[in-house]
Protein backbone atom coordinates (compact mmCIF):
# COMPACT_ATOMS: atom_id res chain seq x y z
CA UNK A 1 0.00 0.00 0.00
CA UNK A 2 1.50 3.33 -1.12
CA UNK A 3 0.95 6.96 -0.12
CA UNK A 4 -1.99 7.56 -2.45
CA UNK A 5 -3.61 4.25 -1.53
CA UNK A 6 -3.30 5.08 2.16
CA UNK A 7 -4.84 8.54 1.82
CA UNK A 8 -7.54 7.54 -0.64
CA UNK A 9 -8.97 4.43 0.98
CA UNK A 10 -12.73 4.18 0.42
CA UNK A 11 -14.82 5.35 3.37
CA UNK A 12 -17.94 3.43 4.28
CA UNK A 13 -21.14 5.48 3.91
CA UNK A 14 -22.61 3.66 6.93
CA UNK A 15 -22.95 5.84 10.03
CA UNK A 16 -23.88 3.10 12.51
CA UNK A 17 -22.77 -0.54 12.70
CA UNK A 18 -25.23 -2.82 14.49
CA UNK A 19 -25.34 -6.53 15.26
CA UNK A 20 -27.68 -8.98 16.95
CA UNK A 21 -26.75 -10.27 20.42
CA UNK A 22 -28.39 -13.68 20.49
CA UNK A 23 -27.53 -14.45 24.10
CA UNK A 24 -29.67 -11.53 25.25
CA UNK A 25 -31.97 -11.09 22.27
CA UNK A 26 -30.83 -7.51 21.68
CA UNK A 27 -29.76 -5.38 18.74
CA UNK A 28 -26.86 -3.12 19.68
CA UNK A 29 -24.36 -0.74 18.13
CA UNK A 30 -21.16 0.89 19.30
CA UNK A 31 -21.36 4.59 20.18
CA UNK A 32 -17.97 6.16 20.73
CA UNK A 33 -19.49 9.33 22.21
CA UNK A 34 -21.18 7.70 25.20
CA UNK A 35 -19.46 8.71 28.45
CA UNK A 36 -19.04 5.89 30.96
CA UNK A 37 -19.08 6.28 34.78
CA UNK A 38 -15.27 6.06 34.86
CA UNK A 39 -14.99 8.96 32.43
CA UNK A 40 -14.00 6.87 29.43
CA UNK A 41 -15.81 7.18 26.13
CA UNK A 42 -17.53 4.46 24.12
CA UNK A 43 -20.18 1.87 24.92
CA UNK A 44 -22.67 -0.53 23.36
CA UNK A 45 -26.09 1.06 22.86
CA UNK A 46 -29.24 -1.02 22.68
CA UNK A 47 -31.64 -0.33 19.81
CA UNK A 48 -35.36 0.02 20.38
CA UNK A 49 -37.31 -2.92 18.93
CA UNK A 50 -38.94 -3.49 16.54
CA UNK A 51 -36.21 -2.00 14.36
CA UNK A 52 -37.34 -0.90 10.87
CA UNK A 53 -35.06 -0.61 7.86
CA UNK A 54 -34.74 -1.02 4.09
CA UNK A 55 -32.16 -3.46 2.68
CA UNK A 56 -30.01 -1.90 -0.04
CA UNK A 57 -26.87 -4.04 -0.50
CA UNK A 58 -25.26 -7.17 0.96
CA UNK A 59 -21.65 -8.25 1.41
CA UNK A 60 -19.92 -10.91 3.46
CA UNK A 61 -16.84 -11.42 5.60
CA UNK A 62 -15.40 -13.83 8.15
CA UNK A 63 -15.27 -12.86 11.82
CA UNK A 64 -15.33 -14.45 15.24
CA UNK A 65 -13.42 -15.37 18.38
CA UNK A 66 -11.70 -18.36 19.93
CA UNK A 67 -11.42 -17.80 23.71
CA UNK A 68 -8.31 -19.20 25.36
CA UNK A 69 -7.20 -19.71 28.96
CA UNK A 70 -5.22 -16.48 29.05
CA UNK A 71 -5.82 -14.74 25.73
CA UNK A 72 -8.46 -14.62 23.02
CA UNK A 73 -7.83 -15.08 19.32
CA UNK A 74 -9.85 -12.86 17.03
CA UNK A 75 -10.62 -13.77 13.42
CA UNK A 76 -11.53 -11.25 10.74
CA UNK A 77 -11.28 -10.73 6.99
CA UNK A 78 -11.68 -8.23 4.21
CA UNK A 79 -15.18 -7.48 2.92
CA UNK A 80 -16.21 -9.64 -0.05
CA UNK A 81 -18.58 -7.87 -2.45
CA UNK A 82 -19.00 -10.46 -5.20
CA UNK A 83 -19.33 -14.23 -4.88
CA UNK A 84 -15.90 -14.78 -6.45
CA UNK A 85 -14.02 -12.18 -4.38
CA UNK A 86 -10.96 -13.54 -2.62
CA UNK A 87 -11.39 -13.57 1.14
CA UNK A 88 -8.26 -13.10 3.23
CA UNK A 89 -8.77 -14.43 6.76
CA UNK A 90 -6.59 -13.05 9.53
CA UNK A 91 -6.05 -14.07 13.14
CA UNK A 92 -4.81 -11.96 16.03
CA UNK A 93 -4.09 -13.36 19.48
CA UNK A 94 -3.96 -10.92 22.36
CA UNK A 95 -1.59 -8.07 21.60
CA UNK A 96 0.38 -10.16 19.14
CA UNK A 97 0.78 -9.41 15.44
CA UNK A 98 -1.92 -10.20 12.90
CA UNK A 99 -1.32 -13.27 10.76
CA UNK A 100 -2.87 -14.43 7.50
CA UNK A 101 -4.26 -17.94 7.98
CA UNK A 102 -6.45 -18.52 4.90
CA UNK A 103 -7.02 -16.99 1.50
CA UNK A 104 -9.39 -17.90 -1.31
CA UNK A 105 -13.00 -17.90 -2.44
CA UNK A 106 -15.46 -18.74 0.31
CA UNK A 107 -16.44 -22.03 -1.32
CA UNK A 108 -12.78 -23.09 -1.22
CA UNK A 109 -11.98 -22.07 2.36
CA UNK A 110 -15.21 -22.66 4.29
CA UNK A 111 -14.24 -26.20 5.33
CA UNK A 112 -10.84 -24.96 6.53
CA UNK A 113 -12.09 -22.19 8.82
CA UNK A 114 -10.87 -22.61 12.41
CA UNK A 115 -13.34 -23.01 15.26
CA UNK A 116 -14.82 -19.65 16.13
CA UNK A 117 -14.40 -18.13 12.66
CA UNK A 118 -17.82 -17.79 11.03
CA UNK A 119 -19.42 -16.32 7.95
CA UNK A 120 -21.13 -12.97 8.51
CA UNK A 121 -23.38 -11.15 6.06
CA UNK A 122 -23.33 -7.37 6.22
CA UNK A 123 -26.54 -5.65 5.22
CA UNK A 124 -26.22 -2.06 4.07
CA UNK A 125 -29.52 -0.59 5.14
CA UNK A 126 -31.44 2.68 5.21
CA UNK A 127 -33.00 3.51 8.59
CA UNK A 128 -35.94 5.90 8.10
CA UNK A 129 -36.09 6.93 11.78
CA UNK A 130 -32.56 8.36 11.54
CA UNK A 131 -32.64 9.08 7.78
CA UNK A 132 -29.20 7.55 7.19
CA UNK A 133 -27.27 4.57 5.85
CA UNK A 134 -26.25 1.98 8.43
CA UNK A 135 -24.72 -1.49 8.45
CA UNK A 136 -26.35 -4.51 10.11
CA UNK A 137 -24.26 -7.65 10.61
CA UNK A 138 -26.01 -11.03 10.60
CA UNK A 139 -24.03 -13.98 11.92
CA UNK A 140 -24.83 -17.26 13.64
CA UNK A 141 -28.47 -17.41 14.71
CA UNK A 142 -29.29 -14.07 13.10
CA UNK A 143 -27.82 -15.15 9.76
CA UNK A 144 -29.83 -18.36 9.75
CA UNK A 145 -33.00 -16.41 10.54
CA UNK A 146 -32.28 -13.89 7.80
CA UNK A 147 -31.64 -16.56 5.16
CA UNK A 148 -34.92 -18.31 5.94
CA UNK A 149 -36.81 -15.01 5.93
CA UNK A 150 -35.28 -13.84 2.64
CA UNK A 151 -36.25 -17.10 0.90
CA UNK A 152 -39.92 -16.45 1.58
CA UNK A 153 -40.22 -12.69 1.18
CA UNK A 154 -39.53 -9.87 -1.27
CA UNK A 155 -36.86 -8.14 0.76
CA UNK A 156 -36.18 -5.39 -1.78
CA UNK A 157 -39.80 -4.27 -2.16
CA UNK A 158 -40.78 -3.59 1.45
CA UNK A 159 -39.43 -2.16 4.66
CA UNK A 160 -38.23 -4.89 7.03
CA UNK A 161 -38.69 -5.13 10.78
CA UNK A 162 -36.47 -6.93 13.28
CA UNK A 163 -37.45 -7.89 16.81
CA UNK A 164 -36.70 -10.46 19.50
CA UNK A 165 -37.75 -13.98 18.55
CA UNK A 166 -38.66 -16.92 20.74
CA UNK A 167 -35.99 -18.59 22.84
CA UNK A 168 -34.23 -21.44 21.05
CA UNK A 169 -32.02 -24.21 22.37
CA UNK A 170 -29.19 -26.14 20.76
CA UNK A 171 -27.78 -28.66 23.20
CA UNK A 172 -27.11 -26.73 26.41
CA UNK A 173 -27.04 -23.38 24.62
CA UNK A 174 -30.03 -21.03 25.00
CA UNK A 175 -30.33 -18.02 22.72
CA UNK A 176 -32.85 -15.69 21.07
CA UNK A 177 -32.74 -15.46 17.28
CA UNK A 178 -34.22 -12.32 15.75
CA UNK A 179 -37.65 -12.37 14.16
CA UNK A 180 -37.80 -10.57 10.81
CA UNK A 181 -41.06 -9.21 9.43
CA UNK A 182 -42.46 -7.35 6.43
CA UNK A 183 -43.62 -3.77 6.96
CA UNK A 184 -45.14 -1.42 4.39
CA UNK A 185 -44.32 -1.70 0.68
CA UNK A 186 -42.28 1.07 -0.94
CA UNK A 187 -44.29 3.74 -2.70
CA UNK A 188 -42.99 5.56 -5.77
CA UNK A 189 -41.34 8.37 -3.79
CA UNK A 190 -39.64 5.94 -1.41
CA UNK A 191 -38.32 3.85 -4.31
CA UNK A 192 -36.80 6.94 -5.88
CA UNK A 193 -35.21 8.03 -2.61
CA UNK A 194 -33.75 4.59 -1.90
CA UNK A 195 -32.36 4.31 -5.44
CA UNK A 196 -30.56 7.62 -4.96
CA UNK A 197 -29.24 6.66 -1.53
CA UNK A 198 -28.02 3.32 -2.85
CA UNK A 199 -25.69 5.03 -5.34
CA UNK A 200 -23.21 5.98 -2.61
CA UNK A 201 -23.17 2.40 -1.31
CA UNK A 202 -22.65 0.96 -4.80
CA UNK A 203 -19.80 3.41 -5.41
CA UNK A 204 -18.14 2.46 -2.12
CA UNK A 205 -18.52 -1.27 -2.73
CA UNK A 206 -17.08 -0.91 -6.23
CA UNK A 207 -13.93 0.52 -4.67
CA UNK A 208 -13.83 -2.36 -2.20
CA UNK A 209 -14.36 -4.90 -4.98
CA UNK A 210 -11.65 -3.30 -7.15
CA UNK A 211 -9.25 -3.59 -4.22
CA UNK A 212 -10.15 -7.27 -3.82
CA UNK A 213 -9.54 -7.83 -7.54
CA UNK A 214 -5.96 -6.56 -7.37
CA UNK A 215 -4.69 -7.73 -4.00
CA UNK A 216 -5.63 -7.63 -0.36
CA UNK A 217 -3.05 -5.84 1.75
CA UNK A 218 -3.25 -7.04 5.35
CA UNK A 219 -2.66 -3.46 6.45
CA UNK A 220 -5.94 -2.46 4.79
CA UNK A 221 -8.02 -4.89 6.86
CA UNK A 222 -9.48 -3.45 10.06
CA UNK A 223 -7.91 -5.25 13.00
CA UNK A 224 -9.91 -3.82 15.87
CA UNK A 225 -13.08 -2.13 14.63
CA UNK A 226 -14.89 -0.90 17.73
CA UNK A 227 -18.28 -2.02 16.48
CA UNK A 228 -17.14 -5.65 16.76
CA UNK A 229 -15.50 -5.47 20.19
CA UNK A 230 -17.15 -7.84 22.62
CA UNK A 231 -18.95 -9.84 19.96
CA UNK A 232 -17.92 -13.06 21.69
CA UNK A 233 -20.70 -12.28 24.17
CA UNK A 234 -23.31 -12.46 21.41
CA UNK A 235 -24.16 -16.07 22.11
CA UNK A 236 -22.28 -19.20 23.03
CA UNK A 237 -20.71 -21.21 20.25
CA UNK A 238 -23.29 -23.74 19.16
CA UNK A 239 -22.09 -27.35 19.15
CA UNK A 240 -21.05 -28.66 15.75
CA UNK A 241 -23.60 -31.43 15.38
CA UNK A 242 -23.90 -31.14 11.62
CA UNK A 243 -27.17 -29.21 11.75
CA UNK A 244 -25.69 -25.71 11.63
CA UNK A 245 -24.36 -25.87 8.06
CA UNK A 246 -25.35 -22.85 5.99
CA UNK A 247 -25.79 -23.33 2.27
CA UNK A 248 -23.86 -20.34 0.96
CA UNK A 249 -25.61 -20.59 -2.40
CA UNK A 250 -28.91 -19.78 -0.66
CA UNK A 251 -27.72 -16.42 0.59
CA UNK A 252 -29.51 -13.82 -1.56
CA UNK A 253 -27.01 -11.52 -3.33
Features from the language model and the residues they span:
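OB-fold ssDNA-binding interfaces and closely related basic DNA-contact patches used
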Residues: 1-130, 170-171
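Polar/charged alpha-helical tracts
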Residues: 36-40, 100-111, 145-152, 188-211, ...
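Long, highly charged low-complexity segments enriched in Glu/Asp and Lys/Arg with interspersed Ser/Thr
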Residues: 58, 171-234, 253
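Extended serine/threonine-enriched, polar tracts that run as long, contiguous segments within proteins
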Residues: 118-183
Amino acid sequence: MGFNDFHNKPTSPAKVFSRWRGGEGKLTHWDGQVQNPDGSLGSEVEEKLPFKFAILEQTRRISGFAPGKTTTTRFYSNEAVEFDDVITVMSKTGDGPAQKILEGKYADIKEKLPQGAKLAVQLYIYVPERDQIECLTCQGASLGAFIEFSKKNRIYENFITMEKGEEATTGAVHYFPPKFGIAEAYDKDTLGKLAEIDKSIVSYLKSVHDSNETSVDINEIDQTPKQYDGEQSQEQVQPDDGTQEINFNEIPF
